Structures are given as structure tokens and as C-alpha cells.
């Protein structure tokens, strides 16, 4: 997007922080999209870049300052001319974080203003294994200064443009929209905090749920085995019961036949076959008395003959 030169606003931005925190690396990454790996202590470097922020063309005049204590006398000069400040510390250096408040207090004293456009930047995010300053510590300091907060990596170009753009918006709006934007950035930070907390909680729950699921799996597996065993057991029981009933039925048939022989064939639970056997038994029993009666008759007749003769 092009604009008339007369309508293009120029912003004086000052990058402030201790030595070795990566101020030059951030600035060069923003200006040239290039990462400077070597550390070369800066006395004072100035850069210019034209950018489009929110459809508005702007020219940034960026002053990269010295962080060494021996150049502290030069600070008040560029603090007077600066419109917005990036307060940079390294997440790998607790000392650089602790001294950041003194930089802000010096800016306040020199500017003699209630509101100073400032963005707190925690650089070297890529060196997570060397971290000495937590994200929460940086966020608390930013809230104390009533300033937005970002963690950046000049090496990996993380949040570099966002840091400068956020500062330009503060300067451009003369702080008029600062509170709403700060709330927006705070919400973003809170969302990140929530995501980090949720992630940690999710990990713990995942571990706990893993054990729970494992326990349930084992329990379900045991229940499944028990159910299966129960089914098998019931099947075997049913089979054994059927076999037992079959044997009992045969035994009962034999027993009923035996009982019929003894005159107990009138039992109500006897089978049809057993009933026939019982009838045959009763017929046999009826025949036996008749046979005995004929024998007795013959015996009596025989005896009678003897008496007659």
C-alpha cells in the first residue's frame, strides 16, 4: 500500500536492555530478516524501515542501544528522543530480567510522563533448556509496568515483528487505545497460560486416565473372562445337568420297573413305557395267584382221592 510522503508518519523506537540479551539480533531480524549469531557489543546503531501496519504506512527509526554499564551516560539522550521502547531481557539470564525495572524507572524519570509506550520482551525463547526466567515472571513484570508482554526468538523469528508492531500501535494511538489493546494482549497471555495449564493438566489426566483405562481394561478383561467362564461354566453345568437327567431318567425307568414288580406301579410320575411294564408286572402278579390256586386245587383233589380210597 502506498501513501503520500506527507501522510507517512515516522516513529522513533528505542531498544533497551542489558548487554547480550539480543537487542541487535532482534533489530536486524526485523529489519533484514537475518539472524546475527555472533555477539558484537553495540555502542549505538540506527536503522530505518518502512512498514505497513493496519493498512497504514509507517517509517520506523529504530535505535539499537548499548547495554553495557559504561555507556549508561548515553541513555538519557536517546530516552529523551524515543517515542516507544522495547524493554528486552533474556529468558536465559535472571540478572538481565532483574535490571529491566531500573531501565523503565530511568525512562519514566527522563520522560516525566504518566504514560510511556513500552513493550516487555523476553528474548531467546529458543534456548528453553537454559531458561532462568519463567513466562509467568515476565508476565507479572509487564502487568506491573502496565505494558504488553511477548517472548521472542530472534534466531527462529518468533514474535519479532509482533513486538515492534505492538509498540508502533501504542505510539500511534498515543495510548488512547492502549487499555483495550493491553486487555487483548493480556487475554492472549491468559489464553496461553490457560493452554499451558490445560496442557499440563491434560498430561496428568492422561497419565491418570491411562492407569484408569488400564485398570478398567484389566477389570473388563477379568469380567469378560469371568463372564466367559460363567458361560462356559453354565454350559458345562447345563450339559452335566442334561446328562444327569438322562441318567436319572434311565435309572428311574429301571427303578420304576423294579417298583412295578413290587406292586408300586401306580406311581403318577411313571413313564408310558414304565406303565406298560407295570401292567405286565400286575398281569404276572395276577397269574401267579391263579397258578397257585390251581396247584392247591390239584393238591386238595389228590388228597381227597386218597381219603376216598
From Swiss-Prot:
Residues 246-256 have a biased composition (Low complexity). GO terms for cellular component: cell periphery; cytoplasm; nucleus; plasma membrane. Keywords: Cell membrane, GTP-binding, Hydrolase, Lipoprotein, Membrane, Methylation, Nucleotide-binding, Palmitate, Prenylation. InterPro entries: P-loop_NTPase (IPR027417), Small_GTP-bd (IPR005225), Small_GTPase (IPR001806), Small_GTPase_Ras-type (IPR020849). Residues 307-309 form a propeptide. A motif (Effector region) lies at residues 39-47. A lipid is attached at residue 306 (S-farnesyl cysteine). Alternates between an inactive form bound to GDP and an active form bound to GTP. Activated by guanine nucleotide-exchange factor (GEF) CDC25 and inactivated by GTPase-activating proteins (GAPs) IRA1 and IRA2. It is an enzyme of class 3 (hydrolase). Its main location: membrane. Present with 2050 molecules/cell in log phase SD medium. Belongs to the small GTPase superfamily. Ras family. This is Ras-like protein 1. It comes from Saccharomyces cerevisiae (strain ATCC 204508 / S288c) (Baker's yeast). The gene is RAS1.
